[in-house]
Amino acid sequence: MTNRDRIGLTWISFFSYALTGAVVIVTGMVLENIAAYFQLPVAQMSNTFTFLNAGILLAVFLNAWLMEIVPLKRQLIFGFVLMVLAVLGLMNSHSLSVFSLCMFVLGVVSGITMSIGTFLITHLYEGRQRGSRLLFTDSFFSMAGTLFPIIAAAILARSLPWYWVYACIGVIYVAIFILALCFEFPQLGKKAVQGQPVAKEKWGLGVALLAVAALCYILGQLGFIGWVPQYATKNMGMDITEAGSVVGYFWTAYMIGMWAFSAILRFFDPQRIVTALALASTLLMYWFINTTDASMLKWIIMGLGFFSSAIYTTIITLGSLQTKVSSPKLVNFILTCGTIGTMLTFVVTGPIVDKAGFHAALATTNSLYAVVFLMCLLLGFVSKHKQHGHMDPH
């Protein structure tokens, strides 16, 4: 593989995370407008976004095998066609069934691109460099989280239809599509060059702990961010623009944190640092949902964004380091568990909001962060990442 191809594929990975971040994160911003569009209660409307999350889950789960059957370039081209059809469906239909189908298709497209993006980084880079590259790649998720709530707020504040937010997100896939046509992808499966057969390795208890941590982290994070706009407006008296800014502060700090930790992780044991970050994030989220001073929210959420930024990517990195040879199926398994957390976001938090309000939903997400801390702490006793020599300097 040429260096030109490596750089091009790395940029596809960056944009794949930006796409998924944009699709998932804008939900909290457009939810109320979509509910009004379909004349449904917000809590009921939130359930339809389960189709989005189910699409992501299905695509990530199946792509562990499909990557070896269907060439990566062909998958991305097919994804572009699906993206165009989904956005056109959102713009031209008033049917809730069509909306749900389009959300599912958007989820499938996001899941395909994110799993390909993650695989490319774990395939192209090794050891400590893999961890820092994954972190930088994941920072594009938070860049989208910074940019698209601002775009969504601007669109909604001007009384433009909510579906223009998704049209803007589609521009990211245009970039992925163009890059996919310009660069060569690694060949997998039967077409790949056969080297020496590698003995199958047992994944071990560490992978199970990381899988639970990934699920609880994503469920906690997206449940938190998904309801923060409503919590800020209904409980703390902010307007929609201020609420969008609070979400933007989180993702801006998240992005900065990723850049910082992509350098820091080179010098520290990833298991220890992820445990410390999970503890700090749990405490900061507790402070956020219990403060009565609205002016403090932006400062607390910036701290939360910064310290939680490296958790999920470090979980994936630690998972890939549990075996001597990086396994796409292992990485996709942890991604799938994280995606299950995405799918459960509104399934779990929607009924809590309906019965007990926004504060109770945020308290639930806080308890999920506490579980992440516990899993990372227990991982210290069983992790194999040091045994395989992955932590040697490169």
Swiss-Prot record:
User: What membrane topology is given?
Assistant: Multi-pass membrane protein
Q: Name one GO molecular function term.
A: transmembrane transporter activity
The source's domain of life comes to Bacteria
Which residue windows are transmembrane per the record? 11-31, 51-71, 76-96, 101-121, 135-155, 163-183, 205-225, 245-265, 273-293, 299-319, 333-353, 362-382
Q: Recite the UniProt keywords alphabetically.
A: Cell inner membrane, Cell membrane, Membrane, Transmembrane, Transmembrane helix
* GO CC terms of this entry: plasma membrane
Extract the SUPFAM superfamilies matched here.
MFS general substrate transporter
Q: Which Pfam families match?
A: MFS_1
UniProt subcellular location: Cell inner membrane
Q: Which residues form the signal peptide?
A: none
Family of this protein: Belongs to the major facilitator superfamily. TsgA family.
Its protein name is Protein TsgA homolog
Q: Which organism is it from?
A: Erwinia tasmaniensis (strain DSM 17950 / CFBP 7177 / CIP 109463 / NCPPB 4357 / Et1/99)
**Which gene name does the record give?**
tsgA
